[in-house]
Amino acid sequence: MKTKVINFYGGPGSGKSTKAAGLYYKMNMAGFSVELNNEFAKECVWEDNVPMLKDQLFMLAHQHRKILRLVDKVEYVITDSPVMLSGIYRELYNGPLYSDLIDKLAKECYDKYDNINFMLDRPKKIFNQNGRAQNEQGSIDIDNAIIEMFKSEKLPFFWLKGLEEEAVDIAFKYVAKKGSKEQWGKYLF
């Protein structure tokens, strides 16, 4: 079994964690071999350790380890903190601590898996700063940087729009279309 990684992309406050958890719930309840990896960066923010976010080598290693330990144990890993975000965040915190070799290392980690990439449409609601290092404008800037990264790296992605439940249903159907007919057939309609 080759592990597939389902990546939820978007700046802080875009709904990555909520939609990733929703897709995990839906796939798990349908009987699929799936695990949810949470965002290590958010753990750092909750611990008031925002300076740790500057060390993107550490952040990348920690986040990738969460995926690597599940390889060949589950068919799907869902993450709200894709490894490719290390290249985006490496420049944000008072200049880069590392060179663009971090970007290359992140791409090497990314290329180890079959990836499904969802870019989230930013919800039209009041931005909640709680648990985030960026403000709303900083988060929108990250959204834009992610789109540029998709283009420059030529990474395929599906733009996921809609309210929480609707977006989770769309993601579920999209993943189903990427899976085998035997496994997903009854979920496609």
Residue spans for each PLM region:
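Phosphate-binding P-loop
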Residues: 1-3
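Hydrophobic anchor at the beta1->P-loop junction of P-loop NTPases
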Residues: 8
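The conserved Walker
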Residues: 12
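Conserved lysine of the Walker
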Residues: 16
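Conserved substrate/cofactor phosphate-moiety recognition/catalytic segment
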Residues: 21-65
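Active-site flanking residues adjacent to catalytic metal/cofactor-binding acidic residues
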Residues: 38, 79-81, 120
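Conserved nucleotide-sensing/catalytic segment adjacent to the nucleotide-binding pocket
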Residues: 49-98
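A glycine- and Lys/Arg-enriched "phosphate-lid" helix/loop adjacent to the NTP-binding pocket
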Residues: 93-173, 179, 184-188
